[in-house]
Amino acid sequence: MPSVPDRAQVVIVGGGIVGVSIAYHLTRREITDVVVLEQNTLTAGTTWHAAGLVSQLKSTQSLTKLAAYSARLFEELEDETGQATGYRTPGSIQVADNEQRWEEIRRGATMADGVGVECREISIDEAAERFPHMRTDDLVGALYIPRDGQTSPVDTTMALARGAKARGATVIENVAVTQLKTKDGKIVGVVT
């Protein structure tokens, strides 16, 4: 296990998917003096509880772009790092049982299409074929998003950690941060 350095440009507290993703993305931007401190082992907190659903159609354009980026990243991460992520893309559908909800879904689809998320309206019959256990007799519309998927949060976190470490980040497990040091209202250090 690496020892905790005296200094680092960036210290990330927490080795779940969010903390490790931050380290991964910082190192992709060539900020490599990054240390991730995890009090237990990577993914030991809430990450391992997550369902890992990757749905790209969100309520705003910014969130839709972020979700689409995540889907692309998850597709490429295993090839980049050699670490399996469990990512698969069975697709998803959004359904509406009233006209107001159907109009909301269609507006979202127009926005998603504008940022490159593939989606298309499908008939109620096609929705029933794709998802035979779903009740469809009360539906007024259905939208199919073929690249939506699911990933293994634990495996994806490990792949992100491997990618971050390959670019220079340090990941240290079994080190608890007990205090944040502040100066003039800013965090300037941690106590372990």
Residue ranges and their predicted role:
Residues V4-V18, V35:
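Beta1/beta-strand and adjacent pyrophosphate-binding region of the FAD-binding site
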Residues G52-R130:
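Dinucleotide-binding Rossmann-like beta1-alpha1 core, especially the glycine-rich loop
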Residues Q100, F131-L139, K181-V188:
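A short, glycine/Asx- and small/polar-enriched loop/turn
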